């Protein structure tokens, strides 16, 4: 604009100068004409100055408007970019939430199981006309399949369901092959809730794994025995313990006088563990009482498994002659021989109930190595003796002494793991039956196992 005004002023000056020169030359212009031209020039200059001022103001306004527009455009671009980012983040979050929802239940559930294939040989003696003779050898093959589900209900509550072959036998989940390839039964092996009510404290409700500590390879309890009822466990620092109450039989209004004759087990175990010899040593004492067992029949399949019984009249029902108030003590010492773990153990039990003659059981043994990781092995041996009424026999190991009390003898064990979760095991029992009562009989049992875990 300033260049235009300057050009106009110069043009006007030149015009005025030319007019004045022409007037002097021609001598015809009057003084009034010159003044008129000067007045017009002054007016023109004033108008030009006003136009220049107006133009400058317009330029300033335009600059401000342009700056504001640029700012608005920048803000719009920023908002658009933020919107895109939020949409992308929202899409990612939605996808992650979807994944979490889809896998949340899976993270709280664990599946486990194992499968065992066994070849078994049993050789025993028998009485024939009051003389001892060899019974026919028995060969059979058996399978065991177990499957479990552990679900975290809350941070301190876990629910477990487990199923196993073997029918309803409380001491065995083995299924003998045969029956012309019939389908084999599968039963509820465990169903319980584990509530961690405090640090080191748990309550188990339902059909649960045996919570009693068993030293070493002791066979006072069968490994398949899963009691039913309540257990409260404590394990903190060097101290541990378990109080338990288990159902045996529920016999509503079965007594002749109209009273109930429900048989139960109640007991308490306490122990401590501490470091010794480069390993851990565990000492424990356990006491249980079989309530309403004497004179009753808390027996699976009416089989006392060696405990003393009697019958009434012509009844074929076996009734327990004695009560069972059993105290147990056990010790287990863990150490190492070179790089191999070594476990030494011993346990002792006695039935404190009245008038029991054969009331003592004991065992001791060792285990060297551990067949767990690839190319690892284990071996062990122990001796065990169980008097006829030393323990309540319904949960006694089902293999030692043909699954009965009134037996003693040795057990040899060996195992090898070619790879992890796969082991080959051999166990040999050479026992004596009827060590307290009747005629002694030799009993041999060989088990060859292939075990898979998953």
Residue ranges and their predicted role:
Residues 197-203, 211-372, 376-379, 383, ...:
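Signature for the C-terminal beta-barrel architecture of outer-membrane proteins
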């Amino acid at each position: 604009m300033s260049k235009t005004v300057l050009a106009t002023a110069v043009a006007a000056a030149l015009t005025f100068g030319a007019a004045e020169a022409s007037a002097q030359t021609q001598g015809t212009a009057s003084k009034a004409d010159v003044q008129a031209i000067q007045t017009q020039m002054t007016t023109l200059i004033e108008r030009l100055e006003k136009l220049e001022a107006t133009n400058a103001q317009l330029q300033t306004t335009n600059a401000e408007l342009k700056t504001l527009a640029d700012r608005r455009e920048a803000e719009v671009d920023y908002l658009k970019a933020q919107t895109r980012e939020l949409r992308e983040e929202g899409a990612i979050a939605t996808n992650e939430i979807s994944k979490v929802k889809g896998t949340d239940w899976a993270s709280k559930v664990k599946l486990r199981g194992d499968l065992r294939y066994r070849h078994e040989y049993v050789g025993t003696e028998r009485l024939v006309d009051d003389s001892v003779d060899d019974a026919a050898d028995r060969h059979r093959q058996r399978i065991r399949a177990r499957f479990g589900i552990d679900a975290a209900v809350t941070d301190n509550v876990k629910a477990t369901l487990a199923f196993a072959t073997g029918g309803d036998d409380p001491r065995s989940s083995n299924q003998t092959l045969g029956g012309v390839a019939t389908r084999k039964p599968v039963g509820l092996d465990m169903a319980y809730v584990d509530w961690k009510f405090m640090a080191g404290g748990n309550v188990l409700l339902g059909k649960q794994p045996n919570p009693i500590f068993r030293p070493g390879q002791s066979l006072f309890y069968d490994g398949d025995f899963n009691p039913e009822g309540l257990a409260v466990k404590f394990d903190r620092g060097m101290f541990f313990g378990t109080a338990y109450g288990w159902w045996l039989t529920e016999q509503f209004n079965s007594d002749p006088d109209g009273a109930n004759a429900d048989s139960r087990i109640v007991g308490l175990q306490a122990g401590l563990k501490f470091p010794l010899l480069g390993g851990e040593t565990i000492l424990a004492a356990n006491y249980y009482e079989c309530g309403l067992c004497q004179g009753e029949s808390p027996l699976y399949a009416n089989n006392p498994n060696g405990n003393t019984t009697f019958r009434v009249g012509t009844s074929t029902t076996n009734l327990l002659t004695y009560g069972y108030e059993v105290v147990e003590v056990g010790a287990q010492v863990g150490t190492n021989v070179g790089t191999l773990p070594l476990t030494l153990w011993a346990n002792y039990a006695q039935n404190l109930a009245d008038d029991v003659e054969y009331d003592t059981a004991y065992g001791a043994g060792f285990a060297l190595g551990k067949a767990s990781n690839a190319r690892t092995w284990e071996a062990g041996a122990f001796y065990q003796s169980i008097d006829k009424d030393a323990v309540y026999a319904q949960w006694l190991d089902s293999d030692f002494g043909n699954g009965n009390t009134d037996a003693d003898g040795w057990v040899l064990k060996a195992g090898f793991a070619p790879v992890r979760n796969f082991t080959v095991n051999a166990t040999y029992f050479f026992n004596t039956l009827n060590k307290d009562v009747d005629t002694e009989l030799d009993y041999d049992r060989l088990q060859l196992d292939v075990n898979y875990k998953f």
